[in-house]
Amino acid sequence: KRALVVGGGIAGMTCALSIARQGHEVHLVEKDKELGGMARRIPTTLEGMDVKAYLDGMIRAVYHNPLIHVSHDAAIKEVTGYVGNFITTVVSEGRVKKIQHGASVIAIGADVYEPTEYLYGENDQVLTHIELGERIANGEEKVIGARSLVMIQCVGCRNEDRNYCSRVCCSHAIKNALKLKEINPEMDI
């Protein structure tokens, strides 16, 4: 039996590796040109783990596993069949493939909320936590040399449309604040 895993981020790759280690063939379908998903934009975890190194190791493991077939720049066009016997039509890098599989895993991840509040997109000093983390990692002087920084939490959520917590923003804020204080102890955050 074969499995189809949709999404080449950490969750999708972990799933593909697990299924392949059990001896099953896996077709891993990723919409981008590279594997890694959102993790490509996160340099470290709150605990200091090097996400890029972890991700690079996982990507190598996926490509070196002969039971895993990766489709990049891919889009699913059609799914037919029934439980245990599906045919999924995928367009990948200009080619059409029909993949027969018995199981599917959807691990499509998430997108960063692009705020409409607080002048985001209008003022280049207003960033998401992901963008701030990238700029800290790149050593951008405008960010790491700033005298003060304000972090506004729960932007775009905890309201009627999105009344939930993403459970990642606070840890990103703490991680970014700790890194900035390490680089620039005089910064007011």
Segments and roles (model prediction):
Residues 33-54:
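Conserved N-terminal glycine-rich FAD pyrophosphate-binding loop of Rossmann-like flavoproteins
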Residues 1-6, 11-12, 18, 56-113:
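Feature captures the FAD/FMN-dependent oxidoreductase FAD-binding
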Residues 47, 54, 58, 81, ...:
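A sequence-level detector of short, solvent-exposed, charge-rich linear segments
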